[in-house]
Amino acid sequence: MTNTNIKKTKFLSFDGSVEIVSQHQRPDKFRDLEQIPKNVTRIGRGGGYSYTAPSFGKNILTQEMTSFNRILEFDEESRTVVVESGITLKELLKWSFEKKLFLKIQPGHPGITIGGCVASNVHGKNPHKDGTFVNVVLEIKLFHPDHGIKILSRTQNSDIFELTCGGFGLTGIILSVKLQLNVLPSDRMVFEKTSVQSLMDAVELFQNNLDADFISSWHDGSPSKKNFGKGVGYKGVFANSFKSSKLIMPKKEGITPFSRARLPFSVLNKTTAAVIYSFYRYCQITGPKTYERNIFDSLFPFGGNAKYYHLLYGKNGLSEYQILVDFKKVEEFIGDLIKLVKIEKPPLIIIFMKPFSGNQKYLRYSSSGVSMALNFQRSPITKKTLSKLDDILISYGAIINIIKGSSKQVVQTCFPEYYKFIEDLKKFDPRRIYKSDLSEKLGL
């Protein structure tokens, strides 16, 4: 390739687990995408905040789409907007806030791009109420060198639309997306904190507040009987009015995979985490039960001070294991999880939970139940524990969030449409031009 925009770059997954040097292009016009020879294996990339490596791989050209960040069309009556795939959630909110509109499904980091949201089919603050990102996607403009530009929607090329939403970028480069926006009720959210003594306490809290705008909990992962599962639940609703016409945003930019890894060692381990989170929980439950937070900090907790959480894992990073368990099976599953933690005593730092509702399709992290994100310090004991947790996960028919990491065997077993996804993808792209480290590891 003679394109001067292509260079060698070292890529790093956000959790620190995958590091690869490969070819890198930052196209700023469509012609840059078109001129790449058709035989070149490639993959699109957004902000680069995935815990795995769906946007880079060995001997694979990464096409970073962050220069494609314009707002192309807006229909005030229908509240729909067409944006280029490289626009970030932060940039979109900055624009939509002025119109008192917002995208109701948003993951926790403001630097994630819309293209990345589509490819990973992300979820937001209450997936039980709002579903996953596919629910706000109306239309996609996709480029594939063998097919040219294709318009995808639920009524046009619907099969490729379904493959692309939660398809990890394997159908081609997402050029633009038409999104459904919602009315923004306020510039603030009002939160209520609830002390929870166990994981099941949080499940009960969820079931009593499924219509909240925001619902989640965090729990101490310490293997000690005294602390495990204790935490705080949060219910949030929009305030009734606007206090300010200006969007309050942090002045400093968020962390990147490389800035996240600047500490040479992990501050968080079994001992320090138990002390830190016991103190933090004490402060949370003894302070005011209700509080207000501006809309930016409400939508993007990892865009504010909480971003430093990831820094505490140091250069070696963290291992996140995110699973979705059916409501009817969650109590028994939690019992087996507690037994495993007591036996193996892994450096399980914290557990985040929220309720889900939806239909599972292809490889999407979507179903009805409770989502649990288990954050471990990376270590040999963690690896051993996760191997045993895989067996428990499979026995309960739960699913795993692929974008947070998993093995081929687990993905094959957890997702009934694993082979259908591969078959349908090959029908559309027989030469399999779009690949990544993630797709290679999972046999996609």
Q: PLM features: what roles do these ranges have?
A:
Residues M1-L444:
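Noncatalytic alpha-helical scaffold of FAD-dependent oxidoreductases
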